[in-house]
UniProtKB/Swiss-Prot annotation:
<dbReference type="GO" id="GO:0016020">
    <property type="term" value="C:membrane"/>
</dbReference>
<protein>
    <recommendedName>
        <fullName>Uncharacterized protein YjfZ</fullName>
    </recommendedName>
</protein>
<dbReference type="InterPro" id="IPR021220">
    <property type="entry name" value="DUF2686"/>
</dbReference>
<keyword id="KW-0472">Membrane</keyword>
<feature type="transmembrane region" description="Helical">
    <location>
        <begin position="182"/>
        <end position="198"/>
    </location>
</feature>
<keyword id="KW-1133">Transmembrane helix</keyword>
<dbReference type="Pfam" id="PF10887">
    <property type="entry name" value="DUF2686"/>
</dbReference>
<keyword id="KW-0812">Transmembrane</keyword>
<comment type="similarity">
    <text>To E.coli YjiC.</text>
</comment>
Length: 264
């Protein structure tokens, strides 16, 4: 099952809940399990400026998401409310704390809960699944040391030949982004995340293409990163798009073998 790629932005403060609300223990499906794999290497799991890092989650392992969930829920100012068994009903309460010009952005608890919800109903997430999930955390180059390691989103990828929505008559791609979720508060986070993804797949050619299917409301955001609509697109609700970073030197460059997103 391939779902449309969307961007979700969560506000930095939700006034309906207080940080004293009692968290609700999450329930999740047996497939919603993973462990963090060891980093691929210092040079290939982050963007060239170390603003964000990505870490693979291994769906073939039967360990639960406890490490990720525990780390997310331990952050100051986050409270989980809701249950994961019968539908989406989660909120994350974030204290209205500021760091430099950014709001406190690690709504990791909500993102983790949403990931569990996604996996709960996707039967193709089995031990032999071709999906790869990358957790996204803030890196040492973010500029605010206290935030290093905070979860800000995740990316789900598929090999280029796997997505049903990308037929052979469309431009040839090397990697498909099936899901991309991030939070507000980190300037240009989406570009940094894609740069980190490019570096994680360093075995792909320099002129690689990344494909995705975006909701029409998010297409302009991806266009700003250099993504182009496929010429044959007729679906008005979704837009299949692809990015060739090498064709956009004003946005993307390589230094010492690492992709860098040039917008600050």
């Amino acid at each position: 099952m391939t779902l449309p790629t969307t961007i979700y932005s969560f506000p930095a403060y939700l006034s309906r809940f207080s940080s004293t609300d009692k968290p609700v223990k999450l329930k999740f499906h047996q497939y919603a399990r993973a462990t963090l794999l060891s980093n691929r290497g210092r040079d290939h799991n982050c963007d060239g400026r170390r603003t964000v890092e990505i870490h693979k989650l291994d769906l073939s392992d039967w360990q639960a998401f406890n490490k990720l969930a525990t780390r997310c829920n331990a952050y100051d100012g986050i409270t989980m409310n809701g249950d994961n068994s019968f539908g989406w009903n989660h909120e994350a309460t974030l204290d209205n704390i500021h760091a430099q010009k950014y709001n406190k952005a690690y709504a990791g608890a909500r993102l983790t809960a949403e990931l569990k919800y996604l996996l709960q109903d996707v039967e193709s997430f089995e031990p032999n699944s071709k999906y790869t999930i990358h957790e996204v955390v803030l890196g040492p180059g973010y500029g605010t040391p206290d935030y290093t390691g905070q979860t800000i989103g995740y990316v789900v990828t598929l090999p280029a030949q796997m997505p049903n929505c990308w037929s052979s008559e469309l431009p040839t791609i090397d990697l498909y982004i099936d899901q991309l979720r991030t939070v507000t508060g980190v300037s240009n986070a989406l570009g940094f995340i894609i740069a980190a993804l490019l570096n994680a797949y360093s075995d792909l050619p320099h002129d690689l293409k990344i494909g995705l299917r975006s909701l029409s409301s998010s297409a302009a955001i991806y266009s700003g990163l250099g993504f182009e609509r496929v010429p044959q697109e007729r679906d008005i609700s979704c837009a299949r798009m692809y990015l060739t970073p090498a064709n956009h030197p004003d946005l993307w460059t390589q230094e010492n073998g690492e992709w860098i997103y040039l917008r600050n």
